[in-house]
Amino acid sequence: MIVLDYALRFPEGLGGIIVTALPMGAVGVSPLKLVLGHILSRIWPTFSLNTGIDQSTGSRDPAVVAANIQDPLRHTRGTARLATEFQATSAWLQTHAHALEVPFFSLHGDADRVARPQGSRNFFERVTTPDKEYREFVGGYHDLYNDINHSEVTAYLCDWLERHLESSWHSKASRI
């Protein structure tokens, strides 16, 4: 969401953007917790609670899941203010998706339970730039770059980058 927010507000100089598992629409946090976060954000913005997101929903690779669980920098807590800002940013992005002017590549796993793929699909449909591409990976979980099909994901990513870096290079060279 951060890269989209930036690209919509400051598109100058960007050659394109790539997003994976865009958290638009339904996410793996219960609606009750999101409403509670919104209410508490006004009076106790630093209040935090467990989001309830299951750490095994990131990847189908057991080694990756185990490493994520052991990583002291990964956690499943969120603050009340995070919930409020997340929802506000998501709504703003949906409203302004049509204004995205740079090449756009969105990737999502169709089995993602953290950020449901329908949200990515809906956002993609609102984007009007002619240079846009959406790729959904069958069985893919939330963390596509660390899922069992990461080679397939990386191949699509490299192909998109090669096509866009080449066209960007030719565009700049023609101006010289």
Predicted regions and their residues:
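Catalytic active-site module of serine/aspartate enzymes centered on a nucleophile-bearing elbow/loop
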Residues: 133-176
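Active-site nucleophile elbow and catalytic-triad environment of alpha/beta-hydrolase enzymes
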Residues: 78-96
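Conserved hydrolase catalytic core segment
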Residues: 1-19, 25
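Conserved alpha/beta-hydrolase "acid-adjacent" motif
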Residues: 113-119
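Short beta-strand/loop motif that positions the catalytic acidic residue
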Residues: 100, 106-108, 112
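Hydrophobic/aromatic beta-strand patches that form the interior of the parallel beta-sheet core
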Residues: 18, 105-107, 135
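Helix-rich cap/lid subdomain of alpha/beta-hydrolase
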Residues: 27-69
